[in-house]
Amino acid sequence: MTFNHKKMEPKWQQYWSEHNTFKTTEDKNKDNFYALDMFPYPSGAGLHVGHPEGYTATDILSRMKRMQGKNVLHPIGWDAFGLPAEQYAIDTGNDPEEFTALNIANFTRQIKSLGFSYDWDREINTTDPEYYKWTQWIFEKLYEKGLAYEAEIAVNWCPALGTVLANEEVIDGKSERGGFPVFRKPMRQWMLKITAYADRLLDDLDLVDWPENIKDMQRNWIGRSEGAEVTFKIKDSDETFNVFTTRPDTLFGATYTVFAPEHELIEKITTPEQKEAVEAYKKQVELKSELERTDLAKDKTGVFTGAYAINPINGEEVPIWIADYVLIQYGTGAIMAVPAHDERDFEFAQQFGLNIRPVLEGGDVTKEAFTGDGPHINSDFLNGLAKAEAITAAIDWLEKEGIGSRKITYRLRDWLFSRQRYWGEPIPVIHWEDGETTLVPEDELPLLLPKATEIKPSGTGESPLANLHDWVNVTDKNGRKGRRETNTMPQWAGSSWYFLRYIDPNNSEAIADKEKLAEWLPVDVYIGGAEHAVLHLLYARFWHKFLYDIGVVPTKEPFQKLFNQGMILGENNEKMSKSRGNVVNPDEVVEKYGADTLRLYEMFMGPLEASIAWNENGLEGARKFLDRIWRLLVTEEGTLAEKVTTDANANLEKAYHHMVKTVTNHYENLRFNTGISQLMIFINEAYKQDTIPKQYVEGFVQLLSPIAPHLAEELWEILGHTETISYVAWPTYDETKLVEDEVEIVLQVNGKVKSKITVAKSLEKEELEKIAQEDNKMKENLEGKTIRKVIVVPGKLVNIVAN
């Protein structure tokens, strides 16, 4: 006997919708709980089975917290700007807005079919002008505080496509689409000064309950380094340049220096005989992406400029080279090379026959770089010193001589905040003919994205907005002509603050009401993929800290607890993808097995954080368990089974209280697979009984409801209730019912186990000894022997020594 999920699930989804069951309560006498999913990009492909894993986890927590008497904020929305919609528009001539709306409608249908308890009244969409008005407002505040600025930045320019490409869209120097040549070209871009927040982004990781590996990824991305900035003079010139080094104590071993090919001094210092080689090398580098340039495994390339620098610590002349592995945007765009103690410098020196001088004792630098620690050698006043002392002494000397100073640098770069795209938030800036740049007045926000009948590349590297002359060209009241900014914001913009808008989604006066922000922040639990470890999570923390500084939000950090669900792989253990043909569509699973089965299966596959292969047999097993529950509790006619009575049943008492305690604890700690195991154990016990107390059945159904809400609502109705199960007080357990009143005793002869018995826990020593001697197996083993001694350890064992 089985239940009909095709009838039952739509019935309860309609009930929840009509009764607005999951509308966020804002009762001042209750605690608040904010459970957040990383909102999806509504792609044309729709949901895949990986999406519901994280969504089910937050839904279980949300449903449990409502039953535990909390106000629960559990919202959903759409991160709907982005490249795929624009690409679709360029390829088909269709409107990205219409395409996006269709995708959102499909995602909404799919999400509702899975029974998630979202408050749909709070739905947001990053492409809605009432939403992006506030994204633009935040940009304006950043600009006013000097944290948004323009800079010339090298981008991936594809002349054939007439557009700028992201690093991911470039493969081996060619565009992913069409295979056209791509060049590095400096272009005017908007930048956000995230580096101003580097220390706080680092230090405040201590305030949050996040996986340590994610914290480490952010720490490494920010990459705080302490060291010194050292000034080198160029021989026979007034020019100087600076390098940053974490090891100023190795300056005596610096035997050459390397510039990034884009360094501004190269043209000035290159000698006539090296000019041609330098120009050719620079052209070659233009075709390479940053990843290709810094690949440690590749052969080192470079070219000598013909110029020399003076090593400031010993006055030696050292050659100046250029090489692609030095990037202009990192540090100063120039490095001092100490080949004896750095692997990359060593390989470069070997390739080009440059001098290698050891300054630390240890290793054999004729064979490989020595990267360990040792006392200093060949280093004049630093000789004999260990690393820490030598660094301090070197910096002190540099500062005294006025040729260097202590410095902290970061690997973190400022955030490149503009895209040469149409489908994004317009940047609310006007460039005037007299050179002034102004913001669009706050009372004129949102600056609307104009409708375009055809989206096509501008051909100049600007976004397609540059083609819309009526929109771009403006005149102020004094007749001064200007051009609107044609770059748009990146997709990361809308997702950097969306969790704030859910708190007060219809506020037209502010991002959200201050009092409401104080009540709901920080987010209690945020669940999503680990792939967002550095970009989204770092950008959101940056914007949140900025909004904290200007008094908009009351907390330093946005997300108190973060959890990353694992990936659901294809049946062959490979990542699911269209090209592999192993993508599982949740619609098909819901049709065949039901949403409750899908939810149960995804939570029971294994630990939430593990990556696990999809398995059809596992789905069938999940459905069988739900059918087992149904058969136990419901008759063929659909009424409550006769074995469910109001009578007590001592045999089930301990199992029930143990289940309530364990399941509650495991749900709280996101250990859903082991929580479900406890539900299964209880059902196995219940099948062995002639009667099951109705109170226990109700408690069980409540514990089941966050996982399988449709089935739970149906069972709750069959149990005689007319209201939804969603707000019924969560079951409690009695600790005294968990105490064992019986205990297993091991019986031994001469220290070897011969038998085991179960006895009352309260049994005295003498009683235990008597029972042990009367045990049949013990009698067999003691036959013909004389008992010399009896050792009794109450609650554990009886050992009879005999010979």
From Swiss-Prot:
Pfam families: Anticodon_1, tRNA-synt_1, tRNA-synt_1_2, tRNA-synt_1g
Motif range ('KMSKS' region): 575-579
Entry EC number(s): 6.1.1.4
Coiled coil: none
Residues annotated as binding ATP: 578
GO molecular function, one term: ATP binding
Motif ('HIGH' region): 40-51
Catalytic activity annotation: tRNA(Leu) + L-leucine + ATP = L-leucyl-tRNA(Leu) + AMP + diphosphate
GO CC aspect terms: cytosol
Keyword annotations from UniProtKB, A to Z: Aminoacyl-tRNA synthetase, ATP-binding, Cytoplasm, Ligase, Nucleotide-binding, Protein biosynthesis
Predominant subcellular localization, coarse grouping: cytoplasm
Gene Ontology biological process terms in this record: leucyl-tRNA aminoacylation
Subcellular localization, as worded in the UniProt entry: Cytoplasm
PANTHER family: LEUCINE--TRNA LIGASE, MITOCHONDRIAL, LEUCYL-TRNA SYNTHETASE
Family: Belongs to the class-I aminoacyl-tRNA synthetase family.
Identification of the protein by name: Leucine--tRNA ligase
Lineage: Bacteria, Bacillati, Bacillota, Bacilli, Bacillales
